[in-house]
Amino acid sequence: MKYDALAIEGEVLDYWDNNSIYKKIKEKNYGKKKYYFLDGPPYTSGKIHIGQAWNKSMKDMVQRYKRMKGLDVWDRAGYDMHGLPTAHKVEAKFGIKSKDEIPNFGIDKFVDECRKLALENMEQMNADFKRLGVWMDFENA
């Protein structure tokens, strides 16, 4: 029998989701000694890359270890949504060559496009990190 990573990993992820395993682990350790994990956030200016996947997997490993030791792990996912990387993506999308062109485009419209891009990418990143098996509080990211 050949190992089929996609099939088996999908089954494991489905099992965790269908049986609320993350929630049960959080409830099991609730009120015990606290461990605060501050997620050094990726930018939401694009899709995840291998470095972010590796980084988040390593963080997940540390948090799982702390949970296995019985600690109540605070594990909210975080994202860096500050302006520059996102603004550059929006400028490229709309062909804006200079910051001086933004008022003509519309400042409110530009800010809305930046917000939309950041939130869309955050949602996709949440899904991608979950697909990697990362257990973090993505609901409150």
Regions found by a protein language model. Give the residues of each.
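N-terminal, positively charged nucleic-acid-binding surface of large information/translation enzymes
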Residues: 1-141
